């Protein structure tokens, strides 16, 4: 039987055995809150700006960082959030968007499945999601996306599963790691509670969190099968108003590639970013044995003002002899959050992102290097997984300006609106490596509007969204294009 089928079946059997084991947890929050619920994130950041939640730019978010009286109530609904959650979900979409945001919108035309949460005290827990995708873009019908198990050892969680991640302060995109691509199966180590160091030497860092993981990429890739994907992020908050994040990711190993301790050491120390492939053809440019990126970000909420500024930068090139990141991608944003507007809470944001290397520089002579971002020398399938880029959903050479708003009111109800302008694939490069640009192979300009509404109806939860695009390839007449989606779920614990 193919390895790609055997491994998921083993995972499913192990998870089912764990979920069916007797426990004393009845309404306990799970170890993590998954990314994808903008309403939840909006409420969490309101608490963070009041200094009641420590860190908010690294998702999944540990439930231990939520206030103790909110852990069972302030949670997302797109995936299981507590030990009593169990039910089914169904989604359908007409023309699923290729330009995903933090919000969990359907990637496929249709998907149906079962999900449940599980917890054993505060030392173990997880979620299981089994689904079937209709007409999947990557050909994978059966899925475990969102499934994980976690075991706590001291103040650390050991995790195994298929978890979505979002690193950075952006609402519309993350340059280094977003939920645009499907999650990969892997193992991780994450800090549980972001309590500060006790030592005087490091206490100034304030609340801090460390996350690291190793995931398994596709069994069959255009470059090297069974490549591994490593990520690490350190975030800290030295002042109540200021949160920093430092992130690294790398592709390594894979069929036909070295994968010993030396390879791992070179990756961790960034030596592999300056070592060249010994098999490079003489007379041609040497090919670096690297597939690493670095990102830094900051979110600043000045005093009691209802405003926050944020920034993220990704460097495509760096190494152990020159740690200064080069070939930079940039994301900037400003957000305004009100306490109460007509009995609800409003957050508005303006965000700009550019995914062309060096497009935004300090020198007047700086010019964008098209065909650079998310492309790699040796791993020439690039920074992508199952047909989608792992970072910002625009893929390389994009530019986006977004005006967005989130309005949360009543229990678990919210509206979300986005107005966006895209300049996609500005270099008009269809294919820089082994894989084409995943959004468009030609330069396009698109104006976009999207509306999303979430809430409960009786025992059911729904999320409904509509969107419209106006534009198309440069030099051609602009056209209108529409899309819509509906997601419905029901929690058996709430059923009569």
Question: How would you describe each model-predicted region?
Answer:
Residues 186-189, 234, 455-457, 479-496:
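Outer-membrane beta-barrel "beta-signal"
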Residues 22-24:
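N-terminal signal peptide c-region/cleavage motif recognized by signal peptidases
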Residues 55-57, 78-87, 119-126, 152-155, ...:
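Short loop/turn motifs that connect adjacent beta-strands in outer-membrane beta-barrel proteins
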Residues 15, 26-104:
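N-terminal periplasmic/intermembrane-space "pro-region" immediately following the signal or transit peptide
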Residues 107-204:
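Well-ordered mid-protein domain cores that form the structural environment of catalytic cofactors
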Residues 86-104, 124-136, 158-166, 170-174, ...:
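Transmembrane beta-strand segments that form the barrel wall of outer-membrane beta-barrel proteins
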Residues 166, 186-380, 396-403, 408, ...:
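Signature for the C-terminal beta-barrel architecture of outer-membrane proteins
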